[in-house]
Amino acid sequence: MSNAMFCYQCQETVGNKGCTQVGVCGKKPETAALQDALIYVTKGLGQIATRLRAEGKAVDHRIDRLVTGNLFATITNANFDDDILAERVRMTCAAKKELAASLTDKSGLSDAALWEASEKSAMLAKAGTVGVMATTDDDVRSLRWLITFGLKGMAAYAKHADVLGKHENSLDAFMQEALAKTLDDSLSVADLVALTLETGKFGVSAMALLDAANTGTYGHPEITKVNIGVGSNPGILISGHDLRDLEMLLKQTEGTGVDVYTHSEMLPAHYYPAFKKYAHFKGNYGNAWWKQKEEFESFNGPVLLTTNCLVPPKDSYKDRVYTTGIVGFTGCKHIPGEIGEHKDFSAIIAHAKTCPAPTEIESGEIIGGFAHNQVLALADKVIDAVKSGAIKKFVVMAGCDGRAKSRSYYTDFAEGLPKDTVILTAGCAKYRYNKLNLGDIGGIPRVLDAGQCNDSYSLAVIALKLKEVFGLEDVNDLPIVYNIAWYEQKAVIVLLALLSLGVKNIHLGPTLPAFLSPNVAKVLVEQFNIGGITSPQDDLKAFFG
C-alpha cells in the first residue's frame, strides 16, 4: 500500500516508525499534506527574513508572529481545519513576496522561498514533494526534523510569552535562521548536531521568557490545594495552556452563575495568585488530554480549547467544543482574537447557561504550585532534608501523558519509588501519579508539581540552585534521576534545553522518538548517555540499587 501521508512527530506514531495512512492523532492525509506545505513555506519565509536581517533591514514583528503561529498550528493535536491551514499557507506566501521585494540580493533563494500557491490543490500537490521524506539521507533528515520539531515547541512558548507582552527579537531571529538552515544542503551532520544543541540553548531562553511573562503577569505560583470535585452550577471547561484566555474568560463569567474548571495542562493556573480571587474558579475536572472523549462528555457544559491537545471530538459533544487561538477543527465554533485583542466569550457563556452542571467523576483535592520561586523559598527545609538523609534522591518525571497502555509504567514506577525520594514534575505526565497517596517527607510532599510542560524550566532552575548550594562542579553530580515521558514537540524542546544545560543520563520513554536515526541516537547516547526505559522493577533497581 502506498503512503497517503508521512508523519512521525509524536510518540504515538504507528509502529514507532510513522503514520502513513491516517494519523493516530486523527489527522487525515489532506491535513497532513497542508501542514507539510505550511512548514515548507515557513522555512522559505525564514530564509528571506534571515537574509533581510543580514542586509541590516528590519523584519516586522508581525512576520515573527506569523512564523511562530505557523509552527504552533502544526503541533500534534492543535489544528485539524484544512481551510485555516490553507489560509496560513496563503498568508505566508504573501509575506514571502512582500519581504523578498525589499531584498537587495535575491540570488540563490531556495524553492521554499520562491514557491507560491493560492489554491489548495496546488498546496496538496506540492506537499508530496517537500515533506519529511524529501530529504534522502537518514541522518540529515533525522537532524533537520529534530530541529524543526524543537522549533515547534519553542514557537509555542514564544507565542504564549508574546500574548503577555514579552518577546525577544533574538529568539525570533534564531527560529527563522534555524528554519532556513534546515533547507541548506551544504550543512554537514556535525553542523546540524551543533544547530540542534543551539536550538536547545534558545529553548532555555524561550522558557525563561515565558516564565517571566507568566509570573510577571499573574504572580509566582504558590503551594495550592485544588478541588477535583464539582459544584452545582453549570460550567465551562478550559483546556490547553493559554493563561490570558483563562483570565478573559474568568472576568467575563464573573457574576453570571457559570463556574469555570480547568482541564489537563490548565490545572497549574490554580497555583497563580492572580486567579485565586475568582470564587467561581471551581477546580480541575478530569485528567490528561487523552481522556477527553469521556470527560468532555460527562462535563455536560461547553469546552474551550486554547491550544493543543484536541482529540477529534465525538458527535455527541462536538457542538459543545469551542476553539480559539491556533486551535481549529472543522465544524467546531471558533472564537476569534489575535494577540493583544479582546476575545468575546459571550457565546460560550450563553451556551453554558443552557447546560446541566458537570457530572462528578472524582472528589477531593490535589496539591501543586512547586515552581522555582516556591521551592527556593523552602530551600532550607529541602537542603536540611537532603543533608540529614531524609531525602536521598529526586526523580524528575516531567513531560507528557498519552494513550499507550505502556504508560502505566510511570504509575508503577512512582508507586515503587523508595520512600526517601521526591518526584519533581511538570506537564501532563503528572496525571499518572499526582492522585496517588505518596505522602510527604518532613512536610515536603513527595510529588512536587511545578506546573505546565514549559515549567520544566523551573525544574532546571531548581537543579542549578541545588548545584550551587551543595558546591558541586557539575549538575550531573546532584542526587537527581531523570525519567521523562514525552509525547509531542514541546517535550522535544524541553529535552534539547536540558541537553544544552549539560544534563546527562536522561531516560526517555515510553519509546525513543521515531525521528531519531540509529546514528543520531548513537550521538545522543555517546555525548549525553540518553537511554530508554525497560520495566518499572528493572529501572527502579538500576536507578536506586
UniProtKB/Swiss-Prot annotation:
It is found in: Cytoplasm. It catalyses: A + NH4(+) + H2O = hydroxylamine + AH2 + H(+). The modification Cysteine persulfide is found at C400. Signal peptide: none annotated. Its EC number is 1.7.99.1. The lineage of its organism: Bacteria, Pseudomonadati, Thermodesulfobacteriota, Desulfovibrionia, Desulfovibrionales. This is Hydroxylamine reductase. [4Fe-4S] cluster binds at C7, C10, C19, C25. Gene3D superfamilies: 1.20.1270.20, 3.40.50.2030. The gene is hcp.
